[in-house]
């Protein structure tokens, strides 16, 4: 318990972390981590040609972190550990052209521990999708602004740390401390919800 308190105190000094991040760290320290030795990346394009370019960018920049990469353009949800979704989010939070209405249901369909909506969507639509139902078995990253190549730079750093044994919340806290003075300028504008099991790629 004392080591946990020390860790949280140290983090609080560095930056004022959101309560969700602090809870994620507590959950990790008390429940351990799940190791995925050969992680599989799924890329699900629900917007056809609208998102082909950024999907290809992400595959080229991030594919080497994974044992296998599966691309789906026909609406079928690929089975994978990490699912990147390229789609428009409707004002009510539903996923346009999706076989499932919510991002949590998409994650469950893939069996993924992490789902990233990798296409930019309006902030109010992102807030709406967070409220939609579904199993909370995967952490979610919802993108508001990719910031050009900043998106790939950011996730390269995240996945590098995860391969070194850091969980997603710990990697996120290291790469993007929640304070304007230390937040990287290139970092994409996102909403991160640490849910489900915390995994490492090792």
Model regions: which residues?
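A short, glycine/acidic-enriched catalytic loop
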Residues: 88-110
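Hydrophobic, helix-forming membrane-interacting segments
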Residues: 2-30
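A short acidic, amphipathic alpha-helical/loop segment
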Residues: 54, 58, 106, 125-132
